[in-house]
UniProtKB/Swiss-Prot annotation:
This reaction introduces a second double bond into the aromatic ring system. Residues 38-47 have a biased composition (Basic and acidic residues). Pathway: Metabolic intermediate biosynthesis; chorismate biosynthesis; chorismate from D-erythrose 4-phosphate and phosphoenolpyruvate: step 7/7. PANTHER family: CHORISMATE SYNTHASE. NADP(+) binds at R46. One of its GO terms (molecular function) is chorismate synthase activity. The keyword Amino-acid biosynthesis applies. This is Chorismate synthase.
Amino acid sequence: MNTLGRLFRVTTWGESHGPALGAVVDGCPAGLPLSEDDVQRELDRRRPGQSGVSTPRSERDRVEILSGVHEGRTLGTPISMIVWNEDVDSSKYEPIRTRPRPGHADVTYRWKYGHVDYRGGGRASGRTTVGIVMGGAVAKKLLREAPSNDPLGIEIVGHVVRVGSVEADPGDLSAEEIMQYAESNPVRCADPDAAEEMLGEIERARENGDSVGGTIEVIAENVPPGLGDPVFGRLDGELAGALMNIPAVKAVEVGSGVRCSEMHGSEHNDPIWWDGHPVVDGDNSGGVLGGISHGGRLVVRVHVKPTPSVSVPQRTVDLESEEEVEIEVEGRHDPCICPRAVPVAESVVAIVLADAVLRAGYVNPDSVELPAASVEDRWRTLKRHL
């Protein structure tokens, strides 16, 4: 599957060393202000070669919007976007054509397809997240500015909270504060002291020809209540499943996550108070109860494995000779992918939420200028069942 979403659908395409990568967004309502600059801002945050902790591959990642937008507004038709690859060097990959790299999808793609594009990981490469970020840029715009008469104002921000053994403690910050601090350093960590230690951890891995993993936290503020469905359509389940589709992600937590197994119920339960309607206060639930959003801020954590491309000798096999061999991976790779994966994780959360607000009726699926339900309208209607 190359498509995420039901009403708001994002289809991505392209390979790491192909001529281009792209995305098609289908189901975005008409009337949403959208420009190439809106998408470019997000792509620039993901772009390679932007700091000493990322791959030296230098790509401008200049987006072109080919359809679905006229005079600066969406048409309600498919939005097609493209980014051309400009700095492709496939020479380092010929030696591994028949030697699957440990930790990569080389061997599993061979099992499934037989004929594969082995250059840079092909379709399995992190490079393909360009399409996710393009789709996420449209989703973020929708969540922030729709509907036109009463925008939801949903803000989504991510930051790195762990690299290797270094864990951040940014304290209780708003989404705006997290963005401000995280975007001020190359690690995208909102804790300045931890950011310095993380840089050291990444540099040590690079010097050893190795890599290091980490954890990204994504927070969404102003998420309305009622998103998601019971049992198999749970919002937290959809978020976890979608985030697990990001290359290198190995685990997802919602709210307190695995820490909840160490807690008592009296400690874990977030209290409820009244503000014209019931409000759940706290992050243990992560913004979701029973698979449905309760109106509090949404909190998820994404655990990212170390980049598998390392120059440390590793054991593999040669598929032609059928002999066991030793391999050292060459090429241009990130010693830690977490800083550039932050906008990718944000984008996936945005796409899932954009789909959910359309399904819940908070945004009219035809046009952002048409009437849609508000939180207050929803509560006035539903409380009649008390």
